[in-house]
Amino acid sequence: LAAGLQRDLFDACQGTDAIVYHPGPSIGYFAARELGIPSILAAPFPMTPTRAYPSLIFYDKTRLGGRANYATHKVFEQIMWMAGKSPIRQFWQQEFGRPPQDFGCPYGRQTTAALPTVVSCSNHVFPRPDDWPEHVHNTGYWFLEDDAGWQAPEDLLAFLDRGAPPVYVGF
C-alpha cells in the first residue's frame, strides 16, 4: 500500500510548476528536488522551530524556556520523518536505484523564499514568532467558503492560464 501511494504521489507531481505538500507524505519535497521545481511545505500546524512556544506534541506540558521549546520542534520533525521515510526510500530505490538527493528530514530544508512554508493556523491561536524566517507564512485557517464577490488577482489568473489546472493531493 505505501509503495503504491508513493508511486501515485510521484506520478501526480509530473509536469507541475511547483509542489505543495503536507508534512505527512513528504515525498513532495523529494519529488520537487528530482524534478527541479520549487516545493512548498503546507503545514496544518506550526512546524518551523521557534523559541516562542513548544511543538504541538509538547504544547500542554510544562514550559521550559526558549532552548527547550526549540528542541521540541526538532524532536517533532524527527518523529514525523521517522514515520514516513521508509516508504519514500523504498519507492526511490525501486524507481531510480538510489535514495533521493540529500535524503534526510525535509522539514528544516524549507529554508528560503524559494522553498517557503505556509502554516494554516490563526495568528490568534499560534502567534507568528519573531524568530521565524520571512519565508514562513502564517496564513490563517483554510476554509472552503463561497465568496461570490471574490476576484482572483491578475497574476494568479495569468499563471493558471499558462498551463494545466493545478492538482492537490492531500486531505
Predicted regions located by residue number:
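Nucleotide-sugar-dependent glycosyltransferase catalytic domains
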Residues: 1-166, 171
